[in-house]
Amino acid sequence: MHRFPPITPLPRMALPARLSRRQVVALLGAGWGCATAPLQAQTVADDALAAVVNGGHRSPANRGRDAARHPLETLRFFGLLPSHTVIELAPGGGWYTEILAPYLRERGRLFAAHYARDDPNAGRRKSRAAFEERLANNPALYDRVKLGTLPEPPAYDRLADIAPPGGADAVLTFRNLHNWLEAGHLDQSLRTFARALKVGGSFGVEEHRAAPGTPLAQMKTSGYVTEDLVIERARAAGFDLVARSELNANPRDTKSHAKGVWALPPTLTNGETDREQYLAIGESDRMTHHYVKRG
């Protein structure tokens, strides 16, 4: 299998730590009449994204994880533009939604596919309810987010109540593939995501990375997935890998933790046991893949 070379992370932009919503909107609206100047348009998009990432609307706790999650560089790598229609899969507590919603608010569209309100798992129902409350409590930021439901048994063939006209420009998933692999519907879900995309649209994947050759059974229990498995399953669903990056790599992660990836921050599921060791490792070693939907 062809190996793509690692991509050097882009430098962070030197912008003020806090920008007002008015400043962010001004950046998002600037420069888009310059259709004949794609480089200028890309620069404006980069500046707008940096403004949102550095925006004062973000919680201190979320901003504190930027050094581990690299949101500016990751979203640039996926080729995201403010005019895009985007589906964010399984947004959890909304860490990335806090960035995507204002970035796409003026010119694009954000769809968030969360767990069902009546999901049989109490934790998932609670997560959905908390996400809905977050959106409702900040309409200035989230009033244009369209909330829908992830494909779950038996409705694998649709993203319930999410149907972007003409298809989405991008579908994004952050640290979710292992859940669908463990649940046994990764392949069906990937096909559903492909159907939601335009031909040539982007599928952005960030996932905890298992060591090459890790057995499937271990992947299902540890939360780490091999790159080869992700590439193979994505290709079978209609995606081609166009680039991969080491933006979210962590060479300190041994991937051999009691209770799997959840032993590491931010979950720290083992409590005080080896807590300092896990904090020293930091967040997991992760692959970052950019796929496109085949025609």
Which sequence ranges carry the predicted segments?
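Conserved beta-strand signature within the Rossmann-like core of class I S-adenosyl-L-methionine
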Residues: 200-207
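A short glycine-rich, Lys/Arg-flanked "PGG" loop and its adjoining helix->strand segment in the class I
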Residues: 187-199
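A short SAM/SAH-binding and catalytic strip from SAM-dependent methyltransferases
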Residues: 169-184
